[in-house]
């Protein structure tokens, strides 16, 4: 159509999947595998997962048992059913990344979390549960939903919820940085900018050379 598409935000995995042409297949639950993993402690689960999918740990939450078991389930299925093969890239992407000093990034993460909580995210999770979404389902929606759900169940205090979330989101951001560096090694160069410089980004878009 002669239009320039923009893909903004999201995780490194989302961007990588678009640029490298992943085809994702639904992965069924594996009851026998889950039963076998029941006796594994967290460290054993991590080692097992990384042994079958070494390059995935930057995008996967290795701190939560259920998510880690699901990641193993997906990795095992993908190994036996290689349906997520890569297609050749039909585009020449221009990837722009915003680079911030570590302390500034941490400050922004904390501020964003405070803003979301003050804007009513706790009430949103409570409302979803009141409408019939069970706690297990809510915890699968992401970090914020997981720990807000635990707070609403009186498993942790408000302060514990905030501190855990702040730490986990920072850890996730660090893993994303590692993922983006890996994209460059895989042939997807990223043009890094010091902060959100809109004019510099516009110049780069208009004249990528």
Regions found by a protein language model. Give the residues of each.
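Phosphate/pyrophosphate-binding catalytic cores of soluble transferases and nucleic-acid-acting enzymes
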Residues: 1-209
């Amino acid at each position: 159509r002669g239009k320039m598409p923009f893909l903004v935000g999201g995780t490194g995995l989302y961007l990588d999947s678009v640029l490298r042409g992943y085809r994702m297949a639904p992965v069924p639950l594996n009851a026998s595998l889950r039963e076998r993993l029941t006796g594994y402690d967290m460290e054993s689960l991590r080692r097992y997962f990384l042994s079958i999918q070494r390059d995935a740990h930057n995008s996967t939450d290795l701190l939560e048992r259920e998510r880690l078991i699901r990641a193993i389930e997906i990795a095992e299925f993908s190994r036996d059913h290689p349906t997520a093969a890569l297609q050749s890239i039909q585009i020449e992407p221009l990837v722009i990344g915003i680079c911030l000093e570590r302390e500034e990034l941490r400050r922004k993460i904390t501020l964003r979390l405070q803003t979301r909580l003050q804007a009513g995210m706790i009430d949103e999770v409570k409302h979803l549960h009141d409408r019939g979404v069970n706690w297990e389902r809510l915890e699968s929606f992401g970090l914020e939903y997981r720990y807000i759900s635990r707070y609403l169940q009186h498993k942790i205090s408000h302060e514990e919820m905030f501190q855990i979330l702040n730490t986990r989101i920072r850890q996730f951001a660090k893993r994303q940085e590692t993922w983006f560096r890996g994209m460059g090694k895989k042939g997807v160069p990223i043009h890094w900018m010091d902060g959100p410089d809109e004019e510099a980004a516009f110049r780069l878009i208009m004249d990528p050379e």
